[in-house]
């Protein structure tokens, strides 16, 4: 008889437990000449592919408006983790040492294509890995492409010189933190400014 109240109490308390969080985090640990780039990935599904992307491949963005689709030829080869097919990476590392990964960011608002060539946001990630060797290059060119996507993400980018940057698209423009403005090379599912307040 005593088991029934204990069981009912246990079931009632179980309903009060918080739900699991979808909380991705990407980081770069740096010490002396060593850097380790890592990520935990909590998402609704976990299937994916490791893809080898060759240099010298001509590419066209897969957009519903082909006239605005960006075209480029990959300058660097890379290895990426893709869940949605070739050319749509969640993150990766190119042969020049540029590493990039993404996290969900609900407040993302991308730049409109306007008169610029455009890509999907996952293609934006592949474009960076295909074309740039350094964080400085990514930062200088972050706003050159329009982005057409329903996926709301932001990026942590690091290079073999141990430079890192966050790239977020807020209010239709790129917002970058690097150098002294990036005291902790880590990113989660909030803007970098919000994350700094958690310290």
List each language-model region with its residue ranges.
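Positively charged n-region of N-terminal signal peptides that target proteins for export
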Residues: 1-4
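Bacterial N-terminal signal peptides
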Residues: 6-16
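Short, basic/low-complexity N-terminal boundary segments at the transition from targeting/disordered tails
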Residues: 15, 65-78, 128-141
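Sec/Tat signal peptide C-region and signal peptidase I cleavage site
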Residues: 17-23
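A contiguous strand-loop segment
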Residues: 23-117, 149-152
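Accessory structured domains or lobes within enzymes
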Residues: 29, 126, 132-199
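Second-shell loop/turn segments in exported
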Residues: 111-115, 123-129
